[in-house]
Amino acid sequence: MNRKLESFAGTTFDIVIIGGGINGAATAREAALRGMKVALVDAHDFAGATSSRSSKLIHGGLRYLDQLEFRLVHEARRERRLLRELAPHLAWPVPFLFPIYQGDPFSPLKVRLGLTIYDLLGNLGTADRHQTLSKEDLLRRVPLLQIEGLLGGSLYHDSLTDDARLTIENIVDAADHGAVVANYAKVLNFDLDSGKANGSPAITTAEVVDNLTGKRYEISSRFWVNATGPWVDYVRALLPGYDGSKTVRLTKGTHIVIPPVAGDFAMFAAILPGKRIFVMMPWHRHGLLGTTDTDYDDDPGQVRPDIADVEYLLRAVNRVLSKPLQTSDVIGAYAGLRALAVQPGASPSENTREYRFHQDPWAANMIAVCGGKLTTSRSLGEKLVDQVAASLPGSSPAGWAEHPTRKTPLPGGHTDNFERFCKDAAADAVRLFNVPRAAAERIVRTYGTRWQQVLEPVRRDRKLADPLAGSENYLGAEVAFAIENEMALELDDFLLRRSGLSWYAAHALADAVPQMAEIFAEHLGWDAAKRDAAVEDFRKAGYFRAS
């Protein structure tokens, strides 16, 4: 995946996507697989905001049943099934427990009814349907649950993902199918033709600056997509005629990394007072607990977890634990922003999670994406590209009407039996590349059928087969692969997004940061000053500190 902003010159694209989060990535992939001329730019790194700071869930929409959003539940369950089939390395099933306590806003009967509807909407076989559990059943599975007040509960299945890697794999596939993609490329302004779209103003070009070099480029396109998430209205404000209206509502969601108190189970439970719930997932031998849901009106680039968020989440989980967690038990924390479609009068938790497409009369050939979820990102991209194709009559090839992402695996997903593949491929990785077994198993599960590409740098440099300092199963080869093939240009790009290591292992990996910086320096031509500054910047960043 090459970053060549000069490729913008001399090309009029069919569609330019601004924003490299999951919505933009899925749209770029959909359009590229249909044969469109596609470009995607992001002012920061791909998955640099919301799409690396989510709850990591690919879920069937159980939480939406309470809001009677049945269409959204049906869509989410369909998309979850597709992702499991087309990218098994990016959507893995996890058992969820739902303990019910005295005083909860929902009774065991209501939960059973909701899960029965959930099963029916998903057309599940007997093995995947929910189970009703007694108090004793729950305690056998999670001995650390609080016994007092426990009435019983349920077990059902959903899926987890690595949100940033899901985003990256979509962008990689878009680039493999001809899309021109660039991170650290910010749109500065637009030029419009006042009568190009049936008498309405239409964007003809945009000026883009390379944030790494300061060089500016012009990019031309027939259609534009504003998929910048929390920055949607900031991009709209660049257009002449912008009226100051808001299309998205920003709410802050904080997650904390804690010890694995529920083992290999994920868990939902009520947060009192009110009707909110927390979710806790098994994540890299830890627990990932979230989330808060509060309005946010400040700079989207400065969102951080604060101590009030951490304490709120600890109070929520401690209600159902026999041994309460302390702030000293918190291993890490992160905060992201939901860019929800505006719904006047709704509280943050009640605001619809359905996505919407918005068009302004002062830019007839731009659609702004409002809302969206990891789970439904593929169908969002499909519907959006359908709308774009319908807006570009006269030169639309027949292939533009196809829906290729319904059946095309994501990179790494080309296998019919993932578990058998993982077992065989891990053995091959150890034999062919002489890497530690633990690293081989994790790499195969993370990258799927792309595992050999990930380990290829080892053939050039045997040092890249060694685990990073402080890690049992992360190799220098992955750093080199991310730089060469996934457009990792800064340490954060690898630590926060290509690997996610900083979210749960930054302290353990402190000694590995100079080692990674050396690999970046060798590949990108950094001098000693740049290398040392990158290390120092990482150490000062304080990704886990709550203010």
Predicted regions and their residues:
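C-terminal catalytic lobe of FAD-dependent flavoproteins
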Residues: 173, 239-288, 294-512, 516-521
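Glycine-rich FAD pyrophosphate-binding loop
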Residues: 32-52
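Helix-loop-beta segment of a Rossmann-like dinucleotide-binding subdomain
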Residues: 119, 139-177, 181, 205-207, ...
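Core beta-strand elements of the Rossmann-like FAD/NAD(P) dinucleotide-binding domain
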Residues: 11-13, 213-223
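Flavin (primarily FAD) binding-site architecture
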Residues: 226-241
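A conserved short coil-to-beta-strand element within the FAD-binding core of flavoproteins
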Residues: 183-204
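Extreme N-terminal leader/targeting segments of oxidoreductases
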Residues: 1-15, 30-34
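Dinucleotide-binding Rossmann-like beta1-alpha1 core, especially the glycine-rich loop
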Residues: 56-141
